[in-house]
Amino acid sequence: YKRQGQMRNTGVELEVRSNNIKTKDFSWTTAFNLSHNKNKILKLADLPWFVDGRYVRKEGYPFNTIYLREYAGVDPETGSALYYDNQQDENGNYTKNKVTDPGQASPIPLKDITPTISGGFMNTFNYKFIDLSFNLSYSFGGYSYDNASYILQDDGYSVISNKSTEQRRRWQKPGDITDVPRFVYGNKKGGNYNSSRAIHSTDHIRLKSLILGLNAPKAWLQKLGIGNARIYFSGTNLLTWAAYDQYDPEMSGVVGFYTPPLKTYAFGLELKF
């Protein structure tokens, strides 16, 4: 093994628990946690930077920085995909000329996939014989690259496979304002070349779990010789609010054809003698 360089990781985690209300018949408790992590490549052994798949490992940048062409949208008159050329001048600044040929557009460091913050928020309620708890998970500031976009968003290059629903927003006539190029059979100038068009925010809030339970009155159970009886409903991954909903937002980095987490529902009966 060879030491490749130096990297600094920093972060903070916060957890807060509270008993919000507690009376004879009602109680409400809350648990909240938050984490913030970041890293930076300080030094590389042999080169100041190198490309590793969809990432660039570069001094001064986060380890998981996506490195691609920068998508510039669609020409409203022709429907052609546009890219920023991103040529560096003598001061190291990138030019922002729009070109239709992706070969004239240089890849640049774009987004760090690591979320800025992530965590969970759990609440538990008890009222007489009823209990309810739910857990929300959240993540903000992260990104992912849709590696399947070269098939699902190929703008007509191949008609063998299915296409993304985003193709409904494609350019169709001069004057259309959209970020999806025209759909042309055999299109070799579409927007499916490796670019920031396939980079998406992973910001989301998810109802990770929910449990609703009903406890039978003790007076009923004593006659039956039962210590406790409870029926409940539970569910996981019930709702998700996401900035981009074409694939599971909990997936980060380079995302392909993956099965999303399933919604699950369960009913149960607990008996204690």
Residue ranges and their predicted role:
Residues 139-230, 235:
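Extracytoplasmic gating/loop element in the C-terminal half of outer-membrane beta-barrel translocons
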Residues 24, 129-134, 219-220:
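Repeated loop/turn-to-beta-strand initiation elements of outer-membrane beta-barrel proteins
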Residues 18-20, 34-40, 127-129, 138-142, ...:
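Transmembrane beta-strands of outer-membrane beta-barrel pores
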Residues 10-16, 117-123, 130, 207-212, ...:
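Hydrophobic, lipid-facing positions within transmembrane beta-strands of outer-membrane proteins
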Residues 30-32, 134, 231-233, 269:
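Membrane-embedded beta-strand positions of outer-membrane beta-barrel proteins
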Residues 2-9, 53-80, 163, 170-175, ...:
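C-terminal beta-signal and terminal closure region of outer-membrane beta-barrel proteins
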Residues 28, 39-55, 141-170, 241-248:
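Outer-membrane beta-barrel and related beta-rich outer-membrane complex signature
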Residues 3-8, 12, 19-113, 153:
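Conserved small-residue
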